[in-house]
Curated annotation (Swiss-Prot):
Induction: Regulated by MYB44. Basal expression levels require the presence of endogeneous salicylic acid (SA). Induced by reactive oxygen species (ROS). Early but transient accumulation after osmotic stress (e.g. polyethylene glycol, PEG). Induced by SA; early induction is NPR1-independent, but full-scale induction is NPR1-dependent. Up-regulated by benzothiadiazole (BTH). Repressed by jasmonic acid (MeJA) by both COI1-dependent and COI1-independent pathways. Triggered by the pathogenic compatible bacteria E.carotovora subsp. carotovora SCC3193. Induced by P.syringae pv. tomato DC3000. Disruption phenotype: Slightly reduced in size. In wrky70-1 mutant, not alteration of responses to both JA and SA. Activation of jasmonic acid (JA)-responsive genes in a COI1-dependent manner. Enhanced disease susceptibility to the necrotrophic bacterial pathogen E.carotovora subsp. carotovora SCC3193. Impaired resistance to the salicylic acid (SA)-monitored fungal pathogen E.cichoracearum. Enhanced JA-induced accumulation of anthocyanins. Compromised basal defense and reduced RPP4-dependent late up-regulation (LURP) of resistance genes (e.g. CML10/CaBP22 and LURP1) upon infection by H.parasitica. Residues 72-94, 201-229 are annotated as: Disordered. Gene3D superfamilies: WRKY domain. PROSITE patterns: WRKY (PS50811). Keywords: Brassinosteroid signaling pathway, DNA-binding, Ethylene signaling pathway, Jasmonic acid signaling pathway, Nucleus, Plant defense, Transcription, Transcription regulation. This is Probable WRKY transcription factor 70. Transcription factor involved in senescence, biotic and abiotic stress responses by modulating various phytohormones signaling pathways. Interacts specifically with the W box (5'-(T)TGAC[CT]-3'), a frequently occurring elicitor-responsive cis-acting element. Binds to the 5'-[CT]GACTTTT-3' motif in promoters of target genes to induce their expression. Binding to the W-box element of PR-1 promoter is mediated by not-sumoylated NPR1 in the absence of salicylic acid. Plays an important but not indispensable role in jasmonate and salicylic acid signaling. The keyword DNA-binding applies. Belongs to the WRKY group III family. Phosphorylated and destabilized by ASK7/BIN2. One of its GO terms (cellular component) is nucleus.
């Protein structure tokens, strides 16, 4: 170590001398005259001596250089990235958080932005958010792939209207789809024909009609249940209730073409063997669905 200190002192002296000689050269250049060549030669000798001294320095061990580098990182990255001393080297125990002075590059997903008048594409999306954007006229909507939780697809997209052309949408796709697009999207149970009729007349719904339809959907229904008895109650309630806007009439001795599809056995369910006629075609759909329940 003493040898290195002596060499360091010699290098400093040579550099100071070279600096002084260069200053003198600058002064001589401003005055045309003699002594320039000798001064330049001295400067060259001074720098050559400095270089030769630097070449004789002992090489720094790799462990020392590693400790110096990690020490500088520890000083700039705070104490969140903990180190353990082990002789001349230090081992990192945990990851360094991305704080000031520690630049941690984050991997970003692939993005693609297009402008289109059509929002639909070949994939299935579900909207999960919307927010107002600063200095923007229109809000931005956020969508995720429908199969995010079923197939782990992380693809998302952002949709926002173009200010200068409100009919156009700026669509940004983030990430690639990893889902199987051929897989069926989970759908809610579709209502059968009876449920649709029941919902269409929701304002005028009948408790008896609701009961009969629930029994139709029950897979554990026993044979010989009281469905026919319920339908016998539904029939007069549907036809003769004043709250309904449909007009129905009971006619004896006359056959209606709209009721021909009902057999004699179906008519027995409703407690009558006569013929019926309806003023509107939509009555037929209601009564035919009720006959199918029997």
């Amino acid at each position: 170590m003493d040898t290195n200190k002596a060499k360091k002192l010699k290098v400093m002296n040579q550099l100071v001398e070279g600096h002084d000689l260069t200053t003198q050269l600058q002064q001589l250049l401003s005055q045309p005259g003699s002594g320039l060549e000798d001064l330049v030669a001295k400067i060259l000798v001074c720098f050559n001596n400095t270089i030769s001294v630097l070449d004789t320095f002992e090489p720094i061990s790799s462990s020392s250089s590693l400790a110096a580098v990690e020490g500088s990182q520890n000083a700039s990255c705070d104490n969140d990235g903990k180190f353990e001393d082990s002789g001349d080297s230090r081992k990192r125990l945990g990851p360094v958080k991305g704080k000031r002075g520690c630049y941690k590059r984050k991997k970003r997903s692939e993005t693609c932005t297009i402008e289109s008048t059509i929002l639909e594409d070949a994939f299935s999306w579900r909207k999960y958010g919307q927010k107002e954007i600063l200095n923007a006229k229109f809000p931005r909507s956020y969508f995720r792939c429908t199969h995010k939780y079923t197939q782990g697809c992380k693809a998302t997209k952002q949709v926002q209207k173009v200010e200068l052309e409100p009919k156009m949408f700026s669509i940004t796709y983030i990430g690639n789809h990893t889902c199987n697009t051929n897989a069926e999207t989970p759908k809610s149970k579709t209502c059968d024909h009876h449920d649709e009729i029941f919902m269409d007349s929701e304002d005028h719904k009948s408790p008896s009609l609701s009961t009969s339809m629930k029994e139709e959907d029950n897979p554990h229904r026993h044979h010989g249940s009281s469905t026919e008895n319920d339908l016998s109650l539904v029939w007069p309630e549907m036809v003769f209730e004043e709250d309904y806007h449909h007009q129905a009439s009971y006619v004896n001795g006359k056959t209606s073409t709209s009721i021909d599809v009902l057999g004699s056995q179906d008519l027995m369910v409703f407690g009558g063997g006569g013929d019926f006629e309806f003023s509107e075609n939509e009555h037929f759909s209601i009564f035919s669905s009720c006959s199918n329940l029997s």
